[in-house]
């Protein structure tokens, strides 16, 4: 019988929307996660705060319409238990057929 060592460790590079969601999903599945983000050391023109899950603009989450790519993706993320979608819905601002959030409140909710 061969013994196997299973390591439950993941390093996620980037603390943007995708990186934060990936890290959270991995933790929920029992992995030990290290999340590395460069903005705390070096900022770019797009970074305002250096915080995790920082959005470029308040409507970055786009359309809610079920026949648009953004609407389809949001439904898929919700079915997967997305942390980011749960946070976005908690602080959503009324904006018609677009999911708009207060960027600073969103970042705090994710963190």
Residue ranges and their predicted role:
Residues 1-2, 77:
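Intrinsically disordered, low-complexity segments enriched in Ser/Pro/Gly/Ala and basic residues
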Residues 3-18:
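Beta1/beta-strand and adjacent pyrophosphate-binding region of the FAD-binding site
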Residues 9-10, 60-61, 97-98:
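Short, contiguous strand/loop micro-motifs
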Residues 18, 24-87:
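N-terminal FAD cofactor-binding segment of flavoenzymes
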Residues 17-20, 108:
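Short alpha-helical segments and helix-capping/turn motifs at coil-helix boundaries
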Residues 76-111:
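Feature captures the FAD/FMN-dependent oxidoreductase FAD-binding
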């Amino acid at each position: 019988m061969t013994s196997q060592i299973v390591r439950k460790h993941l390093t996620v590079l980037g603390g943007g929307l995708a990186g934060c969601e990936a890290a959270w999903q991995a933790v929920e599945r029992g992995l030990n996660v290290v999340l590395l983000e460069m903005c705390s050391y070096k900022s770019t023109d797009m970074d305002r705060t250096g915080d995790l899950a920082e959005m470029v603009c308040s409507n970055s989450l786009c359309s809610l319409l079920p026949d648009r790519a953004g609407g389809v993706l949001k439904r898929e993320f919700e079915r997967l238990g997305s942390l980011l979608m749960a946070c976005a819905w908690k602080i959503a601002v009324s904006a018609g057929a677009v999911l708009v959030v207060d960027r600073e409140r969103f970042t705090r909710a994710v963190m």
